[in-house]
Design a protein with these regions (language model features):
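Long, contiguous binding/interaction regions
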Residues: 1-298
Length: 298
C-alpha cells in the first residue's frame, strides 16, 4: 500500500461474539485493506477495531461495518462501564503514510456525510475535523451519552454536522474525525472502590490539573472485583506512558492501594514502548536507530 490511513472504530458491543464477528467481517479479505487487530471487553461492553488501508477501500469497508453495527446493536439494551452515545461510538482516521492530516480530515468528512445519508445517523465531527472548538474534545461531544443525547441534540450548539437533528432510536449518534495516534492504556488497581479509581483519574487527567495530553476515568471491573483507571494518551510523544503509570502509582499510595497490572487496548506505536523501556532501564543517549526492527523496516 502506497498511501496508508489508519482507522480505529469503536463499537458498543463487547459480549456477543457472533455480533462481533459480523461487525469485523467487512474488514477481512478486502483489497487495499488490512485488519490489524480487534479486541472486545465485556466490562466495557465495547469493541475496538484497528484497520489500515488505502483511503478509498478503507472508506468503503468502514461504511459497511457501520451498517452492520447499526443493524445489530440496540443501545436501549446496552449496559457497560464505558461511556457511549452510539452503536458505532467513534470513528477516528489517522494519517500514517503519504497522507496529510488535511486529507484525513477530508476523508472523515466524506465518511460522516455518507453515514448520515446511508443510515440516517446524526454525525458529529470531532478532533481535527471539528466544526467548532467546543466539539474538538470527544468527551464533550459524548457528554450525556445515548440517553441524554435525545435532548442534547435539540440544542442549537449541538446540532449534528450531518444527518437529522434527532437521535437514532436504537443506534444513537456517532463521532467521526481525524486525529493523531493515541494510546489507549488501562491501569488496574487492587481495590473494588470505584470512588478511589474516580479520584485517581481526576488527579492525573489534564482537565483536573494533571498530565497534559492525558484523559482518564475510573471504571469498575466487577468480574475481577477490582477497579481500573482507563486512560487515553492523546500525544505520547509529549507525555510518555511511564509518566501516567508513575502518577497513578503515587496517587494510589494515598489510599493504601497498589497497581496490579496494566493493559494496552488495540495497537501502540513502537516509539511509545521504547520510550518507556528506555526510562525504566535508565538508558543514556538511546535512539530509535538502535532498534533492530526499526532499522530493518527503513
Amino acid at each position: 500500500m502506497n498511501r496508508i490511513v489508519e482507522c480505529v472504530p469503536n463499537f458498543s458491543e463487547g459480549r456477543d461474539l457472533q455480533k462481533i464477528d459480523r461487525i469485523v467481517a467487512p474488514f477481512r479479505g478486502k483489497q487495499g485493506v488490512k485488519l490489524l487487530d480487534y479486541s472486545n471487553d465485556e466490562d466495557h461492553n465495547r469493541l475496538v477495531v484497528t484497520v489500515v488501508g488505502e483511503p478509498e477501500p478503507l472508506r468503503d469497508a468502514v461504511l459497511e461495518a457501520i451498517g452492520v453495527a447499526v443493524q445489530l446493536i440496540d443501545l436501549n439494551k446496552h449496559q457497560g462501564q464505558h461511556p457511549r452515545m452510539g452503536a458505532v461510538d467513534v470513528v477516528p482516521f489517522i494519517p500514517i503514510k503519504n497522507v496529510t492530516m488535511e486529507e484525513a480530515i477530508a476523508l472523515s468528512k466524506e465518511v460522516g456525510a455518507e453515514v448520515a445519508k446511508r443510515y440516517n445517523l446524526p454525525v458529529f465531527l470531532y478532533e481535527k475535523s471539528a466544526s467548532a472548538p467546543h466539539r474538538e474534545n470527544l468527551a464533550a461531544v459524548r457528554k450525556g451519552e445515548f440517553e441524554g443525547m435525545a435532548e442534547k441534540i435539540k440544542l442549537p450548539e449541538w446540532q449534528p454536522d450531518f444527518g437529522p437533528a434527532e437521535r437514532h432510536p436504537t443506534a444513537g449518534t456517532v463521532a467521526v474525525g481525524a486525529r493523531m495516534p493515541l494510546v489507549a492504556y488501562n491501569i488496574n488497581l487492587n481495590t473494588p472502590s470505584l470512588e478511589i479509581a474516580y479520584d485517581i483519574a481526576k488527579k492525573i487527567r489534564f482537565i483536573g490539573g494533571g498530565l497534559r495530553y492525558c484523559k482518564a476515568m475510573g471504571v469498575e471491573l466487577k468480574d475481577r472485583g477490582i477497579t481500573q483507571v482507563s486512560i487515553n494518551m492523546t500525544d505520547y510523544t509529549r507525555t510518555a506512558l511511564y509518566r501516567a503509570f508513575e502518577l497513578v502509582r503515587i496517587e494510589a499510595r494515598r489510599y493504601g492501594v497498589s497497581i496490579v497490572g496494566s493493559e494496552i487496548i488495540g495497537l501502540v506505536p513502537m516509539e511509545a514502548l521504547i520510550d518507556t523501556a528506555s526510562y525504566y532501564l535508565g538508558q543514556e543517549n538511546f535512539s530509535m536507530q538502535q532498534v533492530l526492527e526499526a532499522r530493518i523496516m527503513e
